[in-house]
A protein has these predicted regions:
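Active-site-adjacent beta->alpha loops and helix N-cap segments on the catalytic face
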Residues: 7-12
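Conserved phosphate/ATP/ADP-binding segment of small-molecule kinases
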Residues: 19-23, 31-102
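Histidine-anchored nucleotide/phosphate-binding helix
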Residues: 15
Length: 154
């Protein structure tokens, strides 16, 4: 289930209405971090994968270091965290000390319009996870999903 970027209280309502939750991915944005922080923190305890961009990660965790930010978000409840770093790719954090992955973005000569690239990225991840039929994808599965998401966002 992909809880696309909307108010965290709405994401929680959608989650509560679904009886069969196989794998839950949530996306957010800076406005919800500022205006519905408590609801967002509650949501993070109920998701398998939390996806956030670089500036949002810094805002949520009140740190400028993305490694520290990723680790702090992992302590808030999700099984995995992805920090999107735009043209620089993404970072994946897992529960184990050795569960960290950094990938670059798919290289392009020119970008016409990056609008919606983050949504395409998350959609590519969700699509890959759904295609392998795993309720609990492995860390390697998530790494593969990021590769697909990166191509989708390009």
């Amino acid at each position: 289930m992909l809880l696309a970027n909307m108010r965290p209280r709405n994401q929680l309502d959608v989650l509560d209405q679904c009886s069969e939750k196989k794998y839950v991915i949530a996306d957010t944005m800076d406005i919800w971090i500022s205006t519905e922080r408590n609801e967002l923190l509650a949501l993070m305890t109920k998701v398998d994968l939390f996806v956030i961009n670089e500036s949002e990660a810094k805002l949520l965790t009140e740190t400028k270091n993305l490694i520290v930010a990723g680790k702090k978000m992992m302590e808030l409840g999700p099984n995995n965290v992805i920090i999107k770093t735009g043209e620089h790719g993404a970072m994946l954090f897992g529960k184990g000390d050795d569960e960290f992955f950094r990938t670059g973005a798919y290289p392009l000569e020119s970008v016409a319009d990056p609008t919606g690239a983050g949504d395409c990225f998350v959609g590519g991840i969700a699509g890959f996870i759904a295609s392998i039929g795993q309720n609990s994808p492995s860390f390697n599965d998530l790494k593969a999903s990021i590769a697909r998401g990166t191509v989708m966002a390009s």
